[in-house]
């Protein structure tokens, strides 16, 4: 019985919807008929005469005020639309029209299969957007105390955002802590130090951890029970405390290197001890994993210190040894540090060998991989490349390969060329980057701009060819050429990672919606009319009457019809009518 009632209601609802969709004219005439029947009880004639009398008594000042009010409202709508577009990247009116008005007008299909498919598609796209908008740690990140803080002292600007530093704190807690830290007082202090927001509190905690370790290091162990001989046993130093001091307290790279060497001595001892005990239980295994992360981090930062201090060959050797010793730790992306150091040495054959290993279709790409490959291809032809000669004779095979490599790199990250060509000013790179985003472009160009300048003609080739990439991908948010479509979320994530004084590069460049342009034009036009009418009422009245006479004249209607017919003939390419021929008998 309930099912029958439900079916009847569904049929009634569908009939009403059908009647409103296809029989709107019938409803319209019914309303007109009711108005005509009820014209006497409703006193429609009297009301119309009252309204006409009221309109006749209105002065021109009322119309001027009305026009000014509409102009003010249009201006407020324009300001709101512009703010909403800058914040969310879309028009508010357009979004409301598509999201709310379109379903009411019957623009949504009610088929359950389509709904299920769309929901699955939405979940897939959301999953893809989450993976594409993953934030990565910058493998070439600077030192806070020796580089970021010195920039703040000189300029008074903060180069790092709170969001970026919060991500670094989470990384430190993941890499440098484990569940057994509470058993060792120094590690327990450092576990709290990594969660501190105040830099001075973190530095004080690191010093406290080293002092506690120094006090507890003198443990008296009797060698023989009946003897008075004692041994002084030194406990291992806290390696993570030295890491924090090297990163945040050291004001020069040389000071940071000294602290990292002390951290290496302490971390290497902890790593060897935990390596022997890692199979004794899950607790020892977690401790060994933590000690491995600490040791790899220290060695990588020592190699970066050597690179900063000009000992590039030593840095390359340290990076190669580290990659051989820990080949599975790809989270640090040490190969990108190695590529930058090899480019500094101009060891292009070694760079090509590293690219052959890491520029694989199964491995995640980066701007360093793609643009370094493009630089090597451009190096072979850039010194002799000329756009005029290429336009006359065409591109050779080597030039075509170089152009394709540049197009591939630009498709992966379209923000990099503006920094390499110095069309946008560089800032200090953040500690975290977003693949294919503006943050990654800054991090790459900050270290690799000198390598592009060193190759003669490379920047000229990039300048002549990089914009051709966009012709191959006219809709980058929907379909890519060699990579997945460009993720939509990069702009929002980059604004969180980059400081407020930097103008975030947006791709693809959003154009102002039609609603904003229309509102701006309408607002300006009505404001101008209101001002002119208020200042010159008689002249504007004569002008309005003249315009009405022109639009209502027969000559204007004839000219408009002729222009319309001529335009139709041009578009349809209607041939002229053949002329009649007269034959004489």
Swiss-Prot record:
Chief place of localization: membrane
Swiss-Prot/TrEMBL keywords: Glycoprotein, Membrane, Phosphoprotein, Transmembrane, Transmembrane helix
Glycan attachment points: 47
Pfam families in alphabetical order: ST7
Annotated Gene Ontology cellular component terms: membrane
Topological category with respect to the lipid bilayer: Multi-pass membrane protein
CDD domains named among the record's database cross-references: ST7
Phosphoserine modified-residue sites: 386
Membrane-traversing stretches: 15-35, 62-82, 512-532
Cellular localization per UniProt: Membrane
Family designation: Belongs to the ST7 family.
PANTHER family assigned: SUPPRESSION OF TUMORIGENICITY 7, SUPPRESSOR OF TUMORIGENICITY 7 PROTEIN
Protein name in the entry: Suppressor of tumorigenicity 7 protein
Gene transcribed to yield this protein: ST7
């Amino acid at each position: 019985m309930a099912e029958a009632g439900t079916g009847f209601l569904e049929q009634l609802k569908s009939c009403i919807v059908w009647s409103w969709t296809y029989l709107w004219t019938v409803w319209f005439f019914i309303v007109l008929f009711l108005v005509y029947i009820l014209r006497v009880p409703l006193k429609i004639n009297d009301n119309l005469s009252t309204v006409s009398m009221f309109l006749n008594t209105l002065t021109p000042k009322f119309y001027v005020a009305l026009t000014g009010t509409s102009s003010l409202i249009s201006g407020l709508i324009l300001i709101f639309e512009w703010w909403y577009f800058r914040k969310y990247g879309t028009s508010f009116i357009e979004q409301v029209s598509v999201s709310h008005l379109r379903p009411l007008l019957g623009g949504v299909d009610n088929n359950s299969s389509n709904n299920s498919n769309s929901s699955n598609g939405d979940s897939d796209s959301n999953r893809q957007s989450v993976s594409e908008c993953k934030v990565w740690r910058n493998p070439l990140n600077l030192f806070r105390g020796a580089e970021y803080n010195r920039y703040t002292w000189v300029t008074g600007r903060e180069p790092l955002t709170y969001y970026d530093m919060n991500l670094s704190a989470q990384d430190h807690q993941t890499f440098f802590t484990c569940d057994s830290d509470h058993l060792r007082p120094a590690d327990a202090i450092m576990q709290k130090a990594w969660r501190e927001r105040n830099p001075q509190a973190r530095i004080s905690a690191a010093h406290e951890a080293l002092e506690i370790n120094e006090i507890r290091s003198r443990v008296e162990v009797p060698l023989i029970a009946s003897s008075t001989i004692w041994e002084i046993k030194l406990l291992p130093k806290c390696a993570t405390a030295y890491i924090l001091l090297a990163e945040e307290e050291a004001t020069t790279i040389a000071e940071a290197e000294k602290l990292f060497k002390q951290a290496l001595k302490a971390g290497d001892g902890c790593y060897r001890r935990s390596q022997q005990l890692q199979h004794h239980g899950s607790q020892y295994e977690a401790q060994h994993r933590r000690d491995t992360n600490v040791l790899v981090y220290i060695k990588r930062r020592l190699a970066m210190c050597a690179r900063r201090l000009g000992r590039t060959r030593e840095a390359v050797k340290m990076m190669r040894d580290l990659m051989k010793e820990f080949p599975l730790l790809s989270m640090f992306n040490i190969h990108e540090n190695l590529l930058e150091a090899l480019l500094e040495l101009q060891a292009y054959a070694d760079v090509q060998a590293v690219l052959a290993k890491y520029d694989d279709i199964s491995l995640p790409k980066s701007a360093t991989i793609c643009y370094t490959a493009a630089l090597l291809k451009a190096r072979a032809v850039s010194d002799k490349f000329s756009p005029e000669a290429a336009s006359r004779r065409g591109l050779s095979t080597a030039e075509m390969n170089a152009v394709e490599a540049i197009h591939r790199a630009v498709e992966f990250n379209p923000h990099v060329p503006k920094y390499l060509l110095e069309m946008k000013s560089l800032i200090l790179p953040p500690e975290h980057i977003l693949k294919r985003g503006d943050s990654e472009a800054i991090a790459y160009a900050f270290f690799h701009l000198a390598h592009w300048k060193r190759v003669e003609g490379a920047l000229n080739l990039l300048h002549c060819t990089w914009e051709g990439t966009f012709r191959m991908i006219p809709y980058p948010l929907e379909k890519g050429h060699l990579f997945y479509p460009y993720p939509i979320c990069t702009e929002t994530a980059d604004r969180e990672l980059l400081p407020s004084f930097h103008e975030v590069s947006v791709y693809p460049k959003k154009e102002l919606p039609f609603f904003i342009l229309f509102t701006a034009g309408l607002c300006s036009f009505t404001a101008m009319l209101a001002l002119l009418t208020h200042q010159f009422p008689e002249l504007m009245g004569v002008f309005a009457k003249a315009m009405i006479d022109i639009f209502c004249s027969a000559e204007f209607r004839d000219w408009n019809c002729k222009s319309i017919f001529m335009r139709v003939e041009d578009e349809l390419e209607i041939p002229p009518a053949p002329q009649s021929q007269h034959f004489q008998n």
